[in-house]
């Protein structure tokens, strides 16, 4: 579903008039920003309220934050920004701390943009089908060798997370790095209008969120919205010279300044990332570091000091097996890259390879074909045992005329886990690849 755009001009907040509890006074965004400066911590989850914060009552498909505004104030929030105009009357005991606006989400987004403008610092936006978070982590560590850097925490990369990222930046920050995720056209454009980046990286264009983007060409258009923004605003992009798709996209925008770099920049830079495809992420970090004046020795140190977590490109040796975990997210492009890398991975004392592959989501009409393609790639790995998890892989497998040997289907992660506890494996090199959203 497309995200709502920001309003034209500055939003107005409705502040309850403390002199007369039945009337409201209009307060421009500047007044709300002054209140934010006095209470710079932002909360959106009433279950985890930071003391003296401002709570934004956001709405979702199955929740309404307005219902929890009074609870947030009880738990220590200084104020609550709400978009239910009846709240001051239904909770008069909290009325002096309720800020009524006509859209809490848009107010949050506009407040974040106001703060970004007040800070006036350079911001690098990172998007792409794969590798966003890894690239963000590498780049932030490299730039932190010279600057005070604030980068997106966790997965706060959407229409709520990006404003929260910006509002977490303090005046001592010298460089901001904002990860931008999207599953439909228009979403990157919205995030750019909030964060107003000066620099950008599109890591790659892959087959991710095909359903929301409407197909591969939609992915290209959607991710290209970062290039569009930077072309209009005089920004600069960092483009891997050996990626013909990204080079073509940059060339199509005549006013776009581009810093092109070869992936050979990653040569000789030691790191703890699994997979040859991570050379692109390392090269991007080196290119950005050099552009902003970080010396090569500090770049190598920063990249080498990064150890992935959250099951992203991790190799873990247990007492019985060696695990390659890449199961934060999965789409056809990242799945294919993992399989190509796993095929080349040496056994290093293990006796066989096992693939545990989980369903790829949000593929729409492309789901069956993409799952069949991944099964065929897995079958090309010699003597590998294939464990497929989820209904999409099961449907694709059953539709194959020629099915790979030594393949087992599991309806869920729980069933697979129970089977492995009952019949544990040992001396195996195991690739675990799938989306965290399927468990």
Task: Tell what function each PLM region has.
Residues 52, 86-92, 201-322, 344-351, ...:
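Acidic, Mg2+-coordinating active-site environments of NTP-dependent enzymes
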């Amino acid at each position: 579903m497309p995200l709502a755009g920001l309003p034209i001009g500055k939003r107005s907040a409705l502040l309850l008039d403390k002199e007369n509890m039945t009337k409201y006074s209009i307060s421009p965004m500047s007044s709300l920003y002054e209140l934010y400066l006095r209470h710079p911590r932002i909360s959106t989850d009433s279950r985890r309220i930071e003391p003296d914060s401002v709570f934004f009552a956001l709405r979702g498909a199955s929740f309404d934050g307005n219902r929890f505004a009074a609870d947030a104030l009880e738990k220590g929030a200084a104020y609550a920004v709400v978009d239910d105009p009846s709240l001051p009357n239904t909770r008069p005991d909290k009325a002096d701390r309720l800020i009524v606006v006509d859209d809490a989400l848009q107010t949050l987004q506009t407040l974040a943009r106001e703060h970004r403008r007040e800070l006036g610092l350079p911001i690098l936006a990172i998007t792409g089908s794969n590798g966003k978070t890894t690239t963000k982590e590498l780049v932030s560590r490299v730039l932190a060798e010279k600057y005070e850097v604030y980068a997106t925490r966790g997965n706060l990369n959407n229409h709520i997370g990006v404003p929260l990222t910006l509002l977490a930046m303090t005046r001592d920050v010298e460089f901001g790095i904002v990860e931008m995720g999207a599953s439909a056209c228009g979403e990157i454009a919205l995030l750019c209008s909030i964060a107003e980046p000066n620099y950008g990286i599109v890591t790659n264009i892959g087959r991710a969120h095909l359903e929301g983007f409407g197909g591969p060409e939609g992915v290209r258009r959607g991710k290209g919205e970062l290039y569009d923004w930077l072309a209009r605003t005089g920004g600069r992009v960092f483009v891997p010279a050996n990626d013909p798709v990204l080079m073509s996209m940059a060339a199509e925008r005549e006013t776009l300044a581009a810093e092109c770099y070869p992936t050979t920049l990653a040569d000789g830079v030691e790191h703890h990332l699994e997979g040859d495809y991570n050379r692109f992420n390392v090269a991007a970090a080196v290119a950005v570091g050099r552009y902003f004046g970080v010396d090569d020795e500090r770049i190598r140190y920063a990249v080498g000091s990064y150890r992935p977590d959250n099951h992203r490109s991790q190799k873990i040796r247990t007492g019985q097996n060696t695990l390659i975990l890449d199961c934060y997210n999965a789409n056809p492009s990242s799945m294919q890259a993992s399989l190509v890398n796993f095929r080349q991975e040496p056994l290093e004392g293990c006796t066989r390879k096992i693939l545990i592959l989980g369903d790829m989501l949000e593929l729409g009409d492309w789901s069956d074909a993409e799952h069949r393609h991944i099964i065929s790639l897995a079958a090309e790995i010699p003597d590998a045992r294939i464990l497929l998890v989820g209904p999409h892989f099961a449907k694709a497998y059953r539709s194959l005329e020629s099915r790979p040997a030594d393949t087992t289907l599991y309806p869920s992660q729980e069933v697979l886990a129970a089977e492995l506890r009952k019949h544990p494996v040992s001396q195996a090199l195991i690739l675990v690849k799938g989306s965290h959203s399927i468990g």
